[in-house]
């Protein structure tokens, strides 16, 4: 059975935890393992933080959009902003690369997303924003409920 959820919220750092918890609560119906749930929460946190800090440059202007589709123990996650976009996507995907060293960012966001998810694709255009598509196949064990 297919189930979908869409949320939109203002690009404020205090909304990052709301996004993480909301997505985790929605995904919980598939009974993921604790590791799977933690990985998805971490990925949501990284993507939303990137949208807020880099996409909107921490301005509080604009929205972050999250779409989650659950189907046959697969999580399809899309996180989108309408911010400044990523000028050099290849460079941005390199471990330790950051455009905000003054904020003590580690530059590991995309690396974490790539390691925790089964598939990731990123679409970005200058001044048009960024869309990240992520896919995770969940195990069929019921470890979370045991």
Curated annotation (Swiss-Prot):
InterPro entries: Anti-sigma-factor_SerPK (IPR050267), Anti-sigma_F (IPR010194), HATPase_C_sf (IPR036890). Belongs to the anti-sigma-factor family. Binds to sigma F and blocks its ability to form an RNA polymerase holoenzyme (E-sigma F). Phosphorylates SpoIIAA on a serine residue. This phosphorylation may enable SpoIIAA to act as an anti-anti-sigma factor that counteracts SpoIIAB and thus releases sigma F from inhibition. Gene3D superfamilies: Histidine kinase-like ATPase, C-terminal domain (3.30.565.10). Its EC number is 2.7.11.1. The lineage of its organism: Bacteria, Bacillati, Bacillota, Bacilli, Bacillales. Keywords: ATP-binding, Kinase, Nucleotide-binding, Serine/threonine-protein kinase, Sporulation, Transferase. It catalyses: L-seryl-[protein] + ATP = O-phospho-L-seryl-[protein] + ADP + H(+); L-threonyl-[protein] + ATP = O-phospho-L-threonyl-[protein] + ADP + H(+). It is an enzyme of class 2 (transferase). Pfam families: HATPase_c_2. This is Anti-sigma F factor. GO terms for molecular function: ATP binding; protein serine kinase activity; protein serine/threonine kinase activity; sigma factor antagonist activity. One of its GO terms (biological process) is asexual sporulation. PANTHER family: ANTI-SIGMA-F FACTOR RSBW, ANTI-SIGMA-F FACTOR RSBW-RELATED. It comes from Bacillus licheniformis.
